[in-house]
Amino acid sequence: MDLLFFDIGATLYGTDASQVLRIDRALPEDLTLAELGLPHRGNRAIVFDTPEGEAHLKVDAVHGVRSIPVNSLRRMPPTAGAAAYAVGVCLEEARTVLLIDLVETARTQGRH
C-alpha cells in the first residue's frame, strides 16, 4: 500500500496516498485538528477530495510516498475507542505511525 507520510507539529502521520490530490501552500482557513496537534508553522497543505469538494489539511512537512507491505499495517480495533479518522497504524522502522483517513478528518471538523 502506498502511504504519504507527513508531520503535524512534532508528530509523524500517514495516510493512504490515493486520497491525496496534491500538496499545496496552506491558507489561513485550512483545516487543523487539535487532536492531531497544532502545526508549528503549517505552511503546507495536503489537498484531498470530499463528497462536497476539495479540502485542505495544514501540515508542517511532507516526507513523500512510500510503498509499505500490508503485513506492516494494523487496523485500529473498534475497542480502542479511537476517533473515526484514526484508521490504523503502520509499523515503520522503530516507531508506530498513526494512519488517518483524510475525509473522516474533514468530517470531524464539520467540513464534509
From Swiss-Prot:
InterPro entries: CheW-like_dom_sf, CheW-lke_dom
Keyword Cell membrane: no
Keyword Hydrolase: no
Record's keyword terms, sorted: Chemotaxis, Transducer
Disulphide bridges: none
Any one biological process term the GO annotation gives: signal transduction
Function: Necessary for proper aggregation of cells to form fruiting bodies. FRZ genes define a system of signal transduction analogous to the enterobacterial chemotaxis systems.
Name assigned to this protein: Frizzy aggregation protein FrzB
Higher taxonomy: Bacteria, Pseudomonadati, Myxococcota, Myxococcia, Myxococcales
